[in-house]
Amino acid sequence: MPISFPVDIQTLYVTGGKDKTIFYPQVTRMQNQTLENFINQSIVQETQALINQQVAEMPTTVAEMLGSFEIKNNQLNVLSLSLTNYTYHDKAAHGMTYIRSLTFDLVDGTHCSLEDLFKPGSNYIERLSDIIKAQIREREIQLINEFTAIHPNQDFYIADKALVIYFQLYDITPYVFGF
């Protein structure tokens, strides 16, 4: 029996010449065309925001830019994906990567924020922050500055049945630690 996912995904791309290619997902063949358009528009907007962020941060010429994506969850009426943009500027010490994630409730037809995953009034920021602090201690992760708490709009995605909280490069750790 073939596996059936809530949404079908195809890969699209745009290129700006040699060494500048952005791959991004497009949702297809959904019964709810309004939701399909909303998801695809959200993906394009976030992909463009990543490009804009990379170009705006450095006054030097972009030598290389690669955009990619990962589908983190496509089951149980939840679509969660991560968009990645790596850019290297001329004469930079190294390239920079940013990741942005989008999570959609396919039943309600909504884009989910971290807050949406918890009951109203719950102290999710403190609880998640405590878990992260414990993991930092257990893994002996070197921090740039002391970690106090996540932000209400903290980056996250859903992978299978797990909530994954992540930080951008340099947010809390040196570059070498990655995401």
Range-by-range predicted roles:
Residues 1-179:
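Compositionally biased intrinsically disordered regions enriched in Thr/Gly
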